[in-house]
Amino acid sequence: MYKEYDLTTISELVHFNLNRKDWIYTDGMQKSLEATQVEGVYGLIQRLKQHDIALLADEVGMGKTIQALGVMSLLWQSKPNAKVLVLAPNMVICDQWRNEFENLRHKHANADLAEAIKHIRPILCKNFIDPDHGVLKEIHQIQNDLEKQALFCLTSIHSLSGLVPEDSKNNCIAVAREKAQEINERIQTVLKDGFDLVVIDEAHYFRNINGGSQRVAAAKGLFGEPNGHTRLAKQYLLLTATPSHSNIHDVNNILGFFKDTKALSPRDSLKRYAVRRLRFMQGLEGAYNKYHYRHEHVLEANFKEDPSSELFFALYQKALVDEYGGKGGGKSFLYGYLEGFESVAQHSKAQEDGSAESFYTAVDTDILSQLSQQFFEKFNQAPAHPKYGVLQNKCVPEDLFDKDHQIENDKNLIFVRRIPSVREITQRINADYDEIFAKQILDALAPPNKTKLFQQWKNKKWSRDFFKKKISNKSNTEDNFEEINESQSLDDESPIKSHILDLFIIKKNDKVKTTDCSNFRNRLVIPSSLFSILLEPSSDYKTGDYLSFYTHEDSQKKADYLSAIRDYRKNHKVLSENIVNFEMPLKTLWADLYIQLKNEDGELLKTYNSWSDVVKENFSHYFKTGILYASPVIVELYCWFSKFVLAKKNNINDVQISYRNFLTWIHNKKLLKTSLLYKYFVAAISTFEALCSKIVGLSFEKNVQPDAWKDLKQLHNPAWYASGEVQNRKRLIIGFNSPFFPNVLSATQIFQEGVNLHLQCNKVFHYGMAWTPGANEQRIGRIDRLFGKVHRNLIKSGQNSGLHIYYPYLKNTFDQEQLASFMVKKQDFEDQLDRGMQSDFDKSIHLSLADDWLKYLRKPKPFNDCGNTDPYPAI
C-alpha cells in the first residue's frame, strides 16, 4: 500500500523540526529527536509492509502520535482513498489526535504532502453504532464512492465496554462478543477487506486477552480472527509506552488480538514487530535521560504536634471497635483512612471511571464519612488528616501575593486511587487558598478589627451575606450597569468550590445576588463600563492610545466603550456614526505591561513582536479571560481598586477622570513591577503558541472568535479534580496547561494515560500509589514530555532544575509498609520496563523492610551524555 520511502524522503515530506524546515536526514548524523522520529516512521512502515502489524513502544513523551500520523499521511499519499480508524482511550484523547493531525497538515507537512492529504477530514465518532455520530454511519456515507473517498474516523476504546443492553447483563460476555461481531460484519459488508489501517493508542488496554471483561470479549469480536477473513483491518499499528505494563506476557497478549504469536517468546515478538527507543532531552549540558533529572521525594506525615488529627484518628478507631468488635478486617480497615476520606457530601458512587483501579469504597468508608461530616458540622472545617496536611503544605503557596513569588511553581498534579480522595483534596486546597484570598481582601479594605472579622467570616464559611454586611466597601458596592450574562462555573453549587472567588460571580438565584467583588468584575467586562477597556491591548498592541467611544441617539441607552476600541483595532477606525471623543486620549494597562516586558525580557519581547496582529488579538482575548475568570489576579486587581477608593482617588462623577486616576495611581505606586498581573502576562506569552496548537487545537495564525476561550470562564477555582463524573475534561486540560487555574489538579487513573499536562507543571504527587511500575511511569509521563516545562527548564537551567516526584505517606503505619515495599521493587523493575522485558510485578507487601528503603528513591544521576541504548531500534 505504501510507496517506496527512504529516510531522506520522509524527512523532506514531514518536517519534524519546525525550527529547521530545511533539515534533511543523512546517514551517520548526530542523534536528535527529529532523526529518531524519521527513523520511527520508516521502521514502522517496513514492519507494516512485512508483517501487517507494528508496535510503536517508544518511551513516554517521545512523539508517538506524530510518528503514527506520519505513517497515516504517507499511506494517504500512496493510496488517496485509504480508510483509517483510530481507537484511543477516550474522546478527549481522540480530540488530541484530531488537533495533532491538523498541526501536521498545516505545519509539519511539506507542500507535496499537504496537497496529498488536503482531502482528509478527521471525524470524531461517539462510538461504532450511534445513528448520528457513529463509525458505521460514516462508512455508509461513502459506500457508493469507495474508490474515491478516503475515511479517517476516531472513536474511543471505551465504546467497546458499552455494547450490552441492560436486559442482557446476565450474559454480558457472550452478548458483548456477539454485538461486536455484528459490527465487524457490517463494516466488512461495505469495506470488503476492512479498514486499510487501524491505529490503537494506549494498546496496553488490550493486555488481558484471556480476561473475562466485556471489553476483551468485544475486542475479539470486533477485531476478528488474527489471520482469518474476518480481520477488521489489513494492517494494525499499535501504540503504547508500556508494552509489558504489568508483566512480560502483556506483549504477546496485546499482539495476540491481531497476530498469532503463540510460537514466539515475548522477546522475539518485540524484535520482530516493535520499535522502542528511550527518550532523551537536549538541554543546557547536553542530552539527558530521565534518570539525570528525576528527583523522588517522600512526604512524611505523622501525628506529632497535631492533637486534633490524633483525636480524630482515636475516634475513628473507637468507631471501628464499636462497629466490628473483635472481628477480623486487619489492615483492610485502614485503607479508607490512609487513602483519604471525604468530609463533604458524597456524590453518586455509580460512576464510570474507566477502570476498576479507581475504587470508591473501603471497609471503613461509611464510618469515616459519618465522623468527618459530624466534625465538619461542629467546627466548620474538615477534620485534620496528617497525610492530607503534608500534601496541602506542598501544593498551596503561602506567599502567593508576595513580590518574590514565582507562579511557575504553582502547578501540581496529584494522582489518587480512591475516587472520594480527588474531591476531598480539591476541597481542602480550595479552602486553603480561600484563607489567602480572604486575608488579602481584608488587608485591602482595612476594616476595624480585621483579625476578628477574619475568624468570624471563616466561621460563616466565607458567606456572601457576611461580606456584604460586615466587610465590603459600602461606598462602592453598586454599579448602574446591566448585568453580564455569565455562565455558571463548573462547580457553582458545589461545597468544594472556592467561596472567596465565588464572591466575584453574580448569583441570579441567590439572596445576595451581587457583591462588591462581582460589581468590580462586572466593570471590567460590561461594554458600557469604561473600565472594561482596562485589560484590553493598546491600540497598536504596544503602547498606543484610544481616542473615542460609541454613544447612542437614544439617551436611555448607555455608551459602548469596549466595542469602539475593538473595532478600532480591527479596522483602524471606529464604525459608528455616534462617536464621542474622550476628554483626552486613554491608554490601557497593556501599555505599562508592554513597557515592563521591554525593559525586563528582551527575548520574550521578540516573541511577542514577531506575532501578527491577528495572533496578538487572539492572545488578548485569552489573557483577559484567564485573568478575570481563572486566576488570583482578579483578587489583586480588586484589592488595588479598593485601596484606590480608600485613598479617595475615585471620582464618582466623572468616569474618565476616575479611570485615568486609577492608571496613574497604579503607575505611581509601581504596582505592576512585582504584580501577579505582570507575572501572568509573561507566563501567558511564553506558552501561548504551544497551548493553541498542541492542546486547544486552534489555528495560531487565523482569526478566532472572542469566545474561543470560554472554557476558562468555567475554571474560577484554584483546585479541581478529574474523575469519571467530570464531563468536560478538556477544559481542565486547557486550564492546567495554561498559567491559569486550576493550579492543582487531582486525578484518578482517568488522566493517567494519553493526556498531555506538561506545559506548566514539573511536579507530580502519588497520593495513592500506582498499582504497577508501568502505571507509575504512565502517571509521570503526563508531565515528563518533550517541549514542556521540564524540557524548558533543562534548556535554561540544566540538570538541577529537575522533575519532582512526591510520595506522601503516614509514618509507622501500613501506609509506610506499602510504599517501602513498592519503592524497593520498583527500582529493579524500571530498568526492565525500559527494555520492555520485566517479569511479573510482585504486588505483595513486605513488612520487614528497615528504614533504609529511602535509599531506593531516585535522585538525579551525575551528568554525562546519556548514551541511551535503544532496546528495539527502528532501523
Label every PLM stretch briefly.
Residues Y767-A770:
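Short beta->alpha connector loops at strand-helix junctions that form conserved
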Residues N743:
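Glycine/proline-rich, flexible active-site/cofactor-binding loop segments
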Residues M1-R47, D52-F740, T748-Q760, S797-I875:
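Helicase motor interdomain insertion/brace
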Residues T772-I795:
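Conserved SF2 helicase motif VI
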